[in-house]
């Protein structure tokens, strides 16, 4: 009786083991089959990490990067999160009976330059549209939208009629000789505008791009505001296109600060965003018909506040990834092919890899504000990689050599990691991140104690101080190292140690793409 019972127990366990093994084999087979069907056997693979896994490193950096926009705000501050900032620029625009008090100060000074500010808004919008879910996962979507709206509120008021756009508040000749807190400014802040007599195509078109992209961001949450933005975008694009002329030529004073090298890229950029916002084929025809004239097909360029071609090429590539009815468009195909050439130039092991790279791996193009091209390139690479993975395209060919889509993402991470401290200097270039970061940032508000009252000139005692800034400009991405990977942390070094809003907008986009398992929506609408 006892032997029989033992025998039956042994048989039961044996059968259970067989069944369990069969189930495991079936699961493994199913996973392999699904992987093969999805194309992962081609070596592309999905984005690493389990769905929804948050990378704390990038999440912490993202929160800081967005905080920098609060530091740069002008106007009457609502829900002020920065203890050493207060209301400023409240009378901006009053000489022409306008309220231009909002907007952002451009960098470490107190000028509101409309051209880079609009670009900041466009990039912020793009980042939110593509990676809003990732931002939301770490509670940063609302801060991003708040900062965007602070800019677009300003841009709306800077465009009081169809063919008039105020593009600057303040005069660098008056502002730059001063070193004071924005709250203490008493100098005159004259206005600069473009109109039919003094056109500025690049600024009008960039502002149109900002308005069009932002209209998509607010389409669901505030349809009325979205419609207002889109109306302004259409008017500004028409103004930019029908009254062509470079603002750098017509207003030569801007050349020393934000000199434009041409307006064709902004026209294509604005038309691309207007197509995404409206699906009006007129705008798609515009980029197809004017590509030969403006797009520099086959010649990779660097994405920046001045040159929007690479961004336009990636944005239009998105249409071919996700809109099958446009797959036969020859005009769009040229944009996508050039976008691929840009990507191949960024991959370190590509036959066409750029030589504009430091020994530590940082994309490096110019001494002044060297981080701009690295952060913009990384942002575009992350986008393109996600477009590929979302549409189940896992390979990119560079002169016959095959690379995985995830290698573009790896490149993007390498640039982000460099900025966050993984570099030969062992320093983070994002203020407040890590144990070692710049202490003497070229930034007036950060360098002067909040309880100090200074005039134009007596604030220079703080500029010349040997003590670190009393206020930390959290999240500011400074200019960056020289090609030989040296860096001087000094207020007297704006070339390397001054932050800008547009660099931070690109950083927000990059970090948002990396903060969790990454993907993009098939439609921006």
UniProtKB/Swiss-Prot annotation:
The active site is at 109 (nucleophile), 442, 489, 498. It is found in: Secreted. One of its GO terms (molecular function) is cellulase activity. The keyword Signal applies. SUPFAM superfamilies: Six-hairpin glycosidases. Pfam families: Glyco_hydro_9. This is Endoglucanase 10. It comes from Arabidopsis thaliana. The lineage of its organism: Eukaryota, Viridiplantae, Streptophyta, Embryophyta, Tracheophyta.
């Amino acid at each position: 009786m006892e032997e029989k019972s033992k025998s039956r127990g042994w048989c039961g366990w044996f059968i259970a083991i067989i069944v369990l093994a069969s189930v495991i084999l079936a699961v493994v087979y199913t996973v392999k089959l699904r992987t093969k069907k999805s194309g992962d056997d081609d070596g592309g693979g999905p984005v690493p990490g389990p769905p929804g896994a948050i990378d704390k490193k990038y999440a912490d950096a993202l929160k800081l990067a967005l905080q920098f926009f609060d530091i740069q705000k002008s106007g009457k501050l609502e829900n002020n999160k920065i203890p050493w900032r207060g209301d400023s620029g409240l009378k901006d625009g009053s000489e022409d009976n306008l309220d231009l008090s909002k907007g952002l100060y451009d960098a470490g000074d107190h000028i509101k330059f409309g051209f880079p500010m609009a670009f900041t808004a466009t990039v912020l919008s793009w980042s939110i549209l593509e990676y809003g879910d990732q931002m939301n996962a770490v509670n940063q979507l609302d801060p991003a939208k708040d900062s965007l709206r602070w800019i677009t509120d300003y841009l709306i008021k800077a465009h009081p009629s169809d063919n008039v756009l105020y593009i600057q508040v303040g005069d660098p000749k008056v502002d730059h000789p001063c070193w004071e807190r924005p709250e203490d400014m008493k100098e005159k802040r004259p206005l600069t505008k473009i109109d039919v007599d003094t056109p500025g195509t690049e600024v009008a078109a960039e502002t149109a791009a900002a308005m069009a992209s932002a209209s998509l961001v607010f389409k669901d949450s505030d349809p009325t505001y979205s419609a207002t933005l889109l109306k302004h975008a259409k008017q500004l694009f028409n103004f930019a296109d029908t009254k062509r002329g470079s603002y750098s030529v017509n207003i030569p004073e801007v050349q020393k600060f934000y000199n434009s090298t041409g307006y064709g890229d902004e026209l294509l950029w604005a038309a691309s965003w207007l197509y995404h916002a409206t699906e009006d084929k007129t705008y798609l025809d515009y980029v197809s018909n004017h590509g030969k004239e403006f797009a520099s097909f086959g010649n990779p360029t660097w994405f920046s506040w001045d040159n929007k071609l690479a961004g336009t090429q990636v944005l239009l590539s998105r249409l071919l990834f996700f809109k099958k009815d446009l797959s036969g468009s020859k005009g769009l195909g040229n944009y996508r092919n050039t976008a691929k050439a840009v990507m191949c130039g960024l991959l370190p092991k590509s036959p066409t890899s750029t030589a504009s790279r430091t020994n530590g791996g940082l994309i490096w193009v110019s001494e002044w504000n060297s981080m701009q091209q690295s952060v913009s390139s990384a942002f575009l690479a992350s986008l393109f990689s996600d477009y590929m993975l979302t549409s189940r395209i896992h390979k990119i060919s560079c002169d016959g050599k095959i690379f995985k889509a995830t290698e573009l993402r790896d490149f993007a991470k390498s640039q982000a990691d460099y900025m966050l401290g993984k570099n030969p200097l062992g320093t983070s270039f994002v203020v407040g991140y890590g144990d070692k970061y710049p202490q003497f940032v070229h930034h007036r508000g950060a360098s002067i104690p909040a309880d100090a009252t200074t005039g134009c000139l007596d604030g220079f005692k703080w500029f010349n101080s040997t003590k670190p800034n009393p206020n930390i400009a959290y999240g500011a991405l400074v200019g960056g190292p020289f090609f030989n990977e040296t860096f001087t942390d000094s207020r007297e070094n704006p070339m390397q140690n001054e932050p800008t809003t547009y660099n931070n907008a690109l950083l927000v986009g990059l970090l948002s793409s990396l903060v969790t398992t990454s993907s993009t929506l098939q439609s921006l609408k």
